[in-house]
A protein has these predicted regions:
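Cytosolic regulatory regions built on CNB/CRP/Popeye-like sensor folds
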Residues: 1-160
Length: 160
């Protein structure tokens, strides 16, 4: 039941009933990662959603010079890889355990098989997924606008 409560916190599952979350939980598996262990590798094929049950992970991206940049730290109740429930595109970042961490993993193939047999569950998932993507797009647009404004101000200062 603890994992069901964890699933309920994830935006794409927020509208699911308890019985539906129990179905999702049936296809989920827990895995423990040691500090420094690679959880997902940048450019590897996306294969599922990872929800952090406990611990701390870091999200890193390599630049064109091979330098690793930390983009974020994620802890208990946070998640990554949700887009791979729909799309098997390569991972955009690597995720590494900072400390011993346990993740609840929902593989794409298992999740797709689950919702394929249940139209209502499929509808709820894609509606929630679209809402999450729209929220992210809004934030990205705001960040892009802010970044353009900062660049404009820098150019003005450099002219003086």
């Amino acid at each position: 039941m603890e994992d069901v409560r964890l699933l309920k916190q994830i935006p794409i599952f927020r509208d699911f009933r308890t019985t539906e979350l129990l179905s999702v939980n049936m296809v989920a598996k827990s895995k423990v990662y040691k500090p420094g262990e690679l959880i997902v590798k940048e450019k590897a094929k996306g294969d599922g959603l990872y929800i952090i049950k406990r611990g701390l992970v870091k999200v890193v991206k390599q630049d064109s010079f091979g330098e690793e940049h930390i983009l974020a730290y994620l802890g208990e109740g946070e998640y990554f890889g949700e887009i791979s429930l729909v799309d098997k595109a390569p991972r955009s970042e690597s995720v590494i355990a900072e400390e011993e961490s346990e993740c609840l993993i929902i593989k794409q193939v298992d999740f797709q098989n689950l919702i394929a047999g249940n139209r209502e569950l499929e509808r709820k998932f894609y509606k929630s997924f679209a809402r999450v993507l729209c929220e992210r797009l809004r934030v990205t647009n705001e960040n892009l606008t802010f970044s353009k404004e900062i660049n404009r101000l820098i150019q003005e200062v450099e002219k003086k």
